[in-house]
Design a protein with these regions (language model features):
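N-terminal glycine/serine-rich phosphate-binding loop of ATP-dependent small-molecule kinases
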Residues: 1-95, 107, 124, 152, ...
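Gly/Ser/Thr-rich active-site cleft segment
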Residues: 9-11, 22, 122-240
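Short acidic-glycine loop/turn motifs at beta-strand connectors
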Residues: 20-22, 88-90, 167-170, 253, ...
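Pocket-flanking alpha-helical
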Residues: 85, 107-111, 245-247
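Carbohydrate-associated surface elements
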Residues: 102
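Alpha-helix C-terminal capping segments
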Residues: 248-254
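Residue-level detector of conserved catalytic or cofactor/ligand-binding positions
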Residues: 257-266
């Protein structure tokens, strides 16, 4: 039997699983890591903790399953969305990652909306709002409040994309994470160059965007040693946790999901 590997880079920990082609769960391992709140409303993590947890959990999952590495045929990702991992010219992490639940960027989000000509203008660029959790506000915050770190930043990634980069050596994201920056034109499925230009960001720092089912690369020799996965294993882009969970629930076509609201509580 062949197996697929999955990695979810969560907020409280990373989970690594192996699933058989018949759908049975062959192994599951979780490793927790800390969250830091240096100021009220701030939420940060050390990306090195994600990687250490991923390597340990995946190696343990392979051992737990008893599966031969050669029978593992693919790997994909989900993970916490919107976090900012800033990388320098050597792809080293510049500062702790700013997470999805960080609330420091309220002023920056309003500034982005104003720069776009108001909410209607922003929707014309991206078909999306700009919320404090989104990555776009974090980029502007870094530019305004940590200009030295911003100047050092040559690339940025979101959390799961950073771990996939360490697995494959390729810097990329998927459409769901790109949308979660608030700077991505959802209809055109590309970053909005006009909006990014208005904000004074350099397009060169933005990652390549893939569809969730696109091949993102292959497990490198070094990553194989650290994780127990086979070298050369195909790695697919995956998506943000809030998106991938819908796929897991079978919400893959129009009419399978809706919403309701409570107008009055008795």
């Amino acid at each position: 039997m062949k197996y697929l590997a999955g990695i979810d880079v969560g907020t409280s920990g990373v989970k690594c699983i192996l699933v058989g082609e018949d759908g049975h769960l062959a192994a599951s391992q979780t490793r927790a890591y800390p969250l830091y709140t240096p100021h009220d409303g701030w939420s940060e993590q050390d990306p090195a903790d994600w990687w250490a947890g991923t390597c340990d959990a995946m190696k343990a999952a392979v051992e737990q399953s008893g599966v031969k590495p050669s029978d593992i045929v693919g790997l994909s990702f989900s993970g916490q969305m919107h976090g900012l991992v800033a990388l320098d010219e050597r792809d080293e992490v510049i500062r702790p990652a700013i997470l999805w639940n960080d609330q420091r960027t309220d002023a920056e989000c309003r500034e982005i909306i104003d720069a776009a000509g108001g909410l209607d203008g922003l929707l014309a660029y991206t078909n999306n709002n700009m919320l404090t959790g989104y990555t776009g506000g974090k980029l502007l915050w870094l530019k305004k409040h940590e200009p030295e770190n911003y100047a050092r930043m040559k690339h940025f990634l979101m959390p799961k994309d950073y771990i996939r980069f360490l697995m494959t050596g390729r810097r990329c994201t998927d459409v769901s994470e790109a949308s979660g920056t608030g700077l991505f034109d959802v209809k055109k499925r590309e970053f909005s160059k006009k909006l990014i230009g208005l904000l004074g960001f350099d397009m060169a720092v933005f990652p390549e965007v893939l569809e969730s089912d696109e091949l993102a690369g292959h497990v490198t020799r070094e990553a194989a040693k650290l994780t127990g996965l086979p070298e050369g294993l195909p790695v697919y882009a995956g998506g943000g946790d809030a998106v991938i969970q819908n796929t897991g629930m079978g919400i893959v076509e129009e009419g399978r999901i809706g919403r309701a609201s409570c107008r009055e509580r008795v």
